[in-house]
Each structure stands twice: as structure tokens, then as C-alpha cells.
């Protein structure tokens, strides 16, 4: 029976270690933190253990079939044994690939909710208009996924948006939206263009995981909290109370603000979420400057030539330059139909992880 015996042996050892961890849970002297750590590891390893046991049963069945074929006294069973052997051979590559994927390290941020920030870059007014288009695209995408989108801060311009920050809560939010970080480029004829020339503009998108307070320590003494009257939509209430909150992290100079909530308490809570995300980003940027998801490596300067994706309106085309994927249905993508692009990016991420892990 042909299969990767070295790989099989390596996975078997990992499974044996997981089974030993399960036994360790019965030790009476474990601390709460040790139990928590073991359970976390077992939760991560459980899918691998289950898949490997299925694979091992198949290999055992194949070896048994080979033994029957080598025994001339069991010729009446040879036909069935051949069928069994062929069946197992046909699924071995599928199982080996599945096990490899289960061996990959899990990005714990994938399950987290996110904070998304959109800023106009090159292109003036057209960039602000495109920013509003992208915001609507993400709003529709989130609605289609059943995710909750909440605006933290929105600054309108005369023709579109100058800035928007929003949080998204749901299942596997960061796992999907993290690929949106970077420079998005649009090519189209602006409504104000009288000669029909195509203009190029860009918007930068940053996607940050929402972190719990225990994940990012913030000393209250390092904060300056200012309150002010909210502006914009919200009715008379926003003009009567100082519900808007601005928080400055003095050691880093990072400033966050929120005015979309109805109360100062709500806005402060949201602003603290934003601050934790920005401090996480700063720490990651300093320690792992090449890690995916960082604004410095993903967003860049916003220059027209520096982009992750292009939206070409005249050709109804969207091209993701990271994986050289072109989809000719911009008209539906800009309305929130992002699944095809995101699924392709996820597949490429897994491919790259496999190559790096087993190289």
C-alpha cells in the first residue's frame, strides 16, 4: 500500500501526544490555568485526531486487503480485496491533504470581530466617492453574512466620505475581512468629467481584530479622555449633551474618537475597543513588521501604483493583484458579492501556509 509513511508516523506521534494530554487532565494537582491550556490545545488538536483515526482505519483495511491478495488460499476473496485496495488508494491523497491542513497553526484572530477603517488616498473628490462605494459594499457584504455592522465614526465630504470607522461582529469575521486590508484602486469616468476620460483613484482599508481588555494591557494613567458634543446625524440629542468621546494614549500619541453612540458610556466603550486594536497593531508592527494584517505592510502609502485590488468600471472588471485573479462582474461585487474573491484568497493563504510549513 503506497502512502507517505514518514508523514503518517509524524502525525501519529502528534496524535499520541494529544491522547496523553487528555490523560493528563485527570491529574489532581493541575492548576486552573494548566487545565485551561490543555483544553485549548485539545480543542485545536481534536479535528486532527479524528481525521487521523479515520485515515489509520483505511490504511489498516488496505494492509489487510494486501495480505489477502498475497494468500493464495484465499483466492475467493481476491476480487473483493482488490476493490477495497483501489477504494483506499483513491482517497489516500485526499486524507493526506486534509491532515496537512489540520496541522497548520491556527490564527487565533480569525474568530475575532473586527474594526475597519477606510481613508481616501490619491484622487481627491473621486477618492471620497469611491470610499463611500466601498463602505456600502462592505455594509452589504456584512448584511449578507448576517454580521452586525456598527459605525464608530463617519466624516462626510462634499461628495462622499472623508473617513469611516466601523466594527463588525459575527462568525469568522476577521478570517474573511482581513484580506481587505490594503490599497483599493478604482478606474472610471467621474460624473464631473466632461471629456469622458478614465480617472484613477485609491482608498486605503485597514482591518484590525477586536481585542479583549485582558489581551492588551492599558494603564488608565496613560489616557487622556475628552468629551465633546457630537456632530452630524443623531437628532437634537447630540446637540444637548457631550456624548462624543476622544481618547488619547499619551505614551504613543494614538488618538481615537467615537460619537455615533447615544451615550457617553457607549462611545467610551467603543473608543477603548478602537484603542486596543490600534495598540495591538502598533505592537505587531514593531515586532513582526512583515506579518499579514498590519497597516504598514498591507495598506501602504495609498499611491495609485501600490494596490491590492483594482475596480475597473469601463470593463466591469475586478482584479485582485495578490493572486492575479480577475472577475468580470464588478457590478455585483461592488454591491457586496465578495465571496468568490475572498474564498480564492483563503485558498491561496492555505496553499502558502502549506508550502512554508512543509518546506
Curated annotation (Swiss-Prot):
Database matches in PROSITE patterns = RF_PROK_I (PS00745)
Source species, domain of life? Bacteria
Assigned keywords, A-Z: Cytoplasm, Methylation, Protein biosynthesis
* Record note on modification: Methylated by PrmC. Methylation increases the termination efficiency of RF1.
Q: Which family does it belong to?
A: Belongs to the prokaryotic/mitochondrial release factor family.
Which Pfam families does UniProt cross-reference here? PCRF, RF-1
Q: What is this protein called?
A: Peptide chain release factor 1
What species is this protein from?
Mycoplasma pneumoniae (strain ATCC 29342 / M129 / Subtype 1)
Q: What does this protein do?
A: Peptide chain release factor 1 directs the termination of translation in response to the peptide chain termination codons UAG and UAA.
One of the record's GO cellular component terms: cytoplasm
Q: Which HAMAP family match?
A: Rel_fac_1
Record's subcellular location: Cytoplasm
SMART domains assigned: PCRF (SM00937)
Provide the gene name from the record.
prfA
Q: List, in alphabetical order, the Gene Ontology terms for molecular function in this entry.
A: translation release factor activity, codon specific
Entry annotated with the keyword Iron: no
Q: For the modification N5-methylglutamine, which residues carry it?
A: 236
Checking InterPro entries in the record gives: PCRF, Pep_chain_release_fac_I, Pep_chain_release_fac_I_sf, Prokaryotic/Mito_RF, RF-1
Does the record bear Nucleotide-binding in its keywords? no
